[in-house]
Amino acid sequence: MRRLLIRCTKIEWITKLIDKKRIMTTQEFLGKKEFAIQDQTVSESCPSNIALIKYWGKYDNQIPANPSISYTLNHCKTNTSLEFIANEAFSVQIFLAGNEEPKFAAKIEKYFSNIEQYLPWILKGKYIIRTENTFPHSSGIASSASGFGAVAKCLMHLDGIFSGKASEEESLRKASFLARLGSGSACRSLYSGLVVWGECQVKESSDLFAVQYPNDEVHEIFKDFNDWVLLIHEGEKSVSSTVGHGLMDTNPYADRRFQEARENFGPMKEILASGDLHQFIKLVEHEALTLHAMMMMSDPAFILMKTGTLEVINKIWDFRKETGLPLFFTLDAGANVHLLFPNNGSEETIKLFIETELLQHTQKNGVVKDIMKF
């Protein structure tokens, strides 16, 4: 009982602190009350991202319980066209790859209503949104990140027309802020390279928006990487990410996990500067497995990995032990495996191993090939 009381008191204190900071800092994103709307169609594209230090657990209004860092992918993107019809009753129609999606439209309507204070014109018309992904919807690549990122970019494009243009830096920061309110990790997709979300020792980092990790503090080995996603399971997840985040509220190991993620930023900064691949592999794989350990220690517990996930992980470990080559993995909140390896001269041997030994564990030899180059 005493432990529970201490934990609740701590959470209440943190929440009050976060609320105070949020009131002080969200003011800069409030929209202009004077605007001139018109019929307009805009189009934007936004990539997905894969986290290295994981975000799992949040407070109200998409405030992360710990900071995270991710790679932005180069090819896996969402392309979105947003048509705004001025002065019609507010409504949203959404077409994903040509098919109307009423459930997603309802979600976007709620999202638009929630961000009206930041875009005061947003409820003054009708929207027809057409969106397509360059990757399979259930591939384990975060379509919500690229999807909300693309929508946020479209909204800022419209805001520039209706309310007056902001600087490119200000517009991008506000797009990241707005994307976060739709899907937390979406805020990281607005920037290229390595991206940080959550207040930490990285300069200008914030819980409210993402910032680009300084490229001049990243060793060249980390600027040209592959991410091959093995499609172990393409069906719907048994537990959604939204539910999973919520279960961290009662997870007895949550506080230690949040502390560990913050602590991991120190070693990660040193690793990125030095080019220490061995330590990078160790930290990234540890973060991936910790994410899934949190799921298994939730109440109720749940497991998103499949048999194929574990078979692939064991084969990667055996391959690395036998060859010393830098093939390693990370996982999102699902069964599919992100295979990470640098373009450092060993990639052809690694690709051959993937194709001959790992593809057999996927559904229909499914793999999505991407790169992170910056």
Language model region names:
Residues 26-28, 121-222:
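Gly/Ser-rich oxyanion-binding loop with an adjacent helix/lid
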Residues 19, 23-61, 85, 91, ...:
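C-terminal nucleotide
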Residues 73-75, 190-192, 223-225, 334:
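Short, solvent-exposed loop/turn segments at the edges of secondary structure
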Residues 4-5, 17:
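Leucine-biased recognition of intrinsically disordered, low-complexity hydrophobic segments
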Residues 22-139, 153-169, 349, 363-374:
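ATP-binding N-lobe of GHMP and related small-molecule kinases
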